[in-house]
Amino acid sequence: MRPHVVFGNRSEARAFALAQRLPADGIFPQGIDHVLFVLGLFFLAPKWRPLLSQTTAFTIAHTTTLGLSAYGIVSLPTRVVEPLIALSIAYVAVENIWRPRLNTARIVVVFAFGLLHGLGFASSLSEVPMPRDQFFTALLAFNLGVDFGQLAVIAAAFLVVGWFRHCDWYWKGIVVPVCSVIATIGGYWTITRLFA
């Protein structure tokens, strides 16, 4: 159920609806890198505790830099942010294979990568034409849209592979191949974005 929000005028409501719809409209193909990162978090361990710890760290981080960047407090060039986002995808996927355990270091790394993804989200938000007096509404809506998108990706992953997580072959038969593909894509994007 979507949260109920009361608006003072129609233009504010339109701003909210437009900004909240943008993450969903752009999740494929423009936001596929964020989808792959969330899948990387999922495949560390498809259990609620590891997922909750990682997604909470990621959400706090990307919300922070999204807000700071949107208000012009923090800024990095897209040519720097995009390769690093791609590298974050490759990193979490490789770590899932070589060190498949939740620990403090993993949470710190996810938080750091979340800061980068927030800068990427800010770039998408900048595409929404908003009057300045409606900007906070758009920022709130966009962030809610991102969070709904993350939940949708995790729910879809559970529906597709969650049934097999207790099988003996789950790690070798699903996690390793899928994370290998994710890591390869992330590595390829890192190189192509560096030299774009």
Over which residues does each language-model region extend?
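Hydrophobic alpha-helical transmembrane segments in multi-pass membrane proteins
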Residues: 25-196
